[in-house]
């Protein structure tokens, strides 16, 4: 299972680097395009998260992998 987590982490890092890398001479991405990419990445991270909690409008992931029914993350502190 550790290899799968490592593979997913490397894939997301490569995807993130590819989407935001700008070669010299290229025009910057439009705001709409950047917002769409950010939304897709956030959606992927939420799908991979097994313990997603929101507190006072701030949502955070508290664990990747493992059982969704039995999260092993620490409790949310204020």
UniProtKB/Swiss-Prot annotation:
Single GO cellular component term: extracellular region
Keywords: Antimicrobial, Fungicide, Plant defense, Secreted, Signal
GO terms classed as biological process: defense response to fungus; killing of cells of another organism
Subcellular location: Secreted
Signal peptide: 1-21
Chief location: secreted
Family designation: Belongs to the DEFL family.
Name used for this protein in its record: Putative defensin-like protein 288
Protein's organism: Arabidopsis thaliana (Mouse-ear cress)
